[in-house]
Amino acid sequence: MTDNPVVNSAATTANFSEQQRRLNASIHKAHDPLPPCLAEANKFRGFDRKFRTDAIIAWLDQEEAANPSFDRLSFLQMHSSSASTDPAVFVALALEYKAAGLKEEALSAINRAMALHQTDLHSQRVFMDIRFWADPSAQNPKELDAYLAEHFCAYPFEHFETVPDGNIFVCCPSYLPVPIGNLKKETAERIWAGDAAQLLRESILDGSFRYCSRLHCGRISNRTLNLAKSHSAHSIKIKGGKQEPEEQDLALPKVLVLSHDRSCNLACPSCRKDFIIAKKEEQTALNIFLEESIIPILSNARLINITGSGDPFGSNHFRALLKILNRDKYPHLQVDLHTNGQLFDERAWAELSLHGMVRNVEISIDAAKAETYAVVRRGGSFDRLLRNLKFISNLRKAGEIKQLAFSFVAQALNFEEMPAFVRMAEYYGVDRVEFNMIRNWGTFSAEEFSAEFIGSKFHPLYERFLEILESEEMSREIVSRGNLTLYQ
């Protein structure tokens, strides 16, 4: 080859481009080993991209075998800079760094993968493995596996969560990101007894929890699951590969979590880029969906939760649903409300007939100061919030609400206020304060998310975050640290 550096550079670029083409072809041909009922959903939602990472590693092995001078790490470094939207590439890069003994680089690469796709279970598993390898004081993934093998979660046997596209989940989609069907295409009964639902339940019963997020689920990270020997676990058994009830009726779900309308009176940056209110046509479709798909299974439910997608009072659709709920029509039904509290005032309460039905109210706040609230709750008024909190607190004191919780999503912008937030919650007589780490719901670029993700050891304020977690307020009885414990 000529010694001309320009010619050499062009040849190198051409060779690299050809290698990229072959790698992309291998990834494209990769077979997803998940059962067919899950593989189709994985194609669109990408909840487990392990097969893509495996395809990358296999291709690197082939290239190295064919050409011993092939530098797999250098290639992946170059490839990741030009294929920066595929988390599988960064997972593979993290694994290569780990093989080379490069701890900081491995952590940086896997953090990038996580920033690109928050619900990819494989990225999460690799993150936990690499973090423990780099820092043995971190949570040991094998110890967590052993814990899960002896414990049980009732959610896949009880919960039925709707989302805007019609998909149904048996838990929060961030905690168990695998849909079991689509209510716009199938009946609730068919979905609830379907193959996907059965597989998710089997993953609990066999102790693998293979479809659950060990990173985002607070019940897993805080180890608050019931023992597998508990009554809840023994009320379910499997015959011939299918779950059959002993003491529970599994014909229909007992808990409905309605998150199919994203309408909200606020535009919180961690949740959405702009205000979302259902237009007339959308409202009509939502009402038809309610009448045809939700109302028929409501009489079997024992708990309804509104809403994890927007606000129950900021949504005309959900507010209309709340107005038809009453003790006479649904004598066994309890109601959970998840709201920003801006519209939950005396007038809104008077429009409802929920007396004696409200089990839990969770107010999502994320701030203890007006100036921070103005940013994290775009469109909201801190003064209005405080007025409404006083009213809601009085409902709790009067027994109209059985449990009152405040929630806080920790991020770079607000984490300094966590101790003050606990004190604020105590002032209003709150039963529980829920903390969780910020997640990327698709509203942030990878760079923007990295700037807010205070749980990364690479964040310039990470050490200060650890100090805040050790504050006296964060150890008080009403505090649940959620998944924050994983980032210590």
At which residue positions do the language-model features occur?
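Conserved alpha-helical substructure of the radical SAM core
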Residues: 179-180, 219-361, 371-389, 395, ...
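Radical SAM enzyme [4Fe-4S]-AdoMet core and its adjacent flexible, acidic
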Residues: 118, 132-186, 259, 280-287, ...
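"A position-specific structural signal for the A-helix of alpha-solenoid helical repeats
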Residues: 58, 92, 126-129
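Membrane-interface junctions of multi-pass transporters
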Residues: 176-219
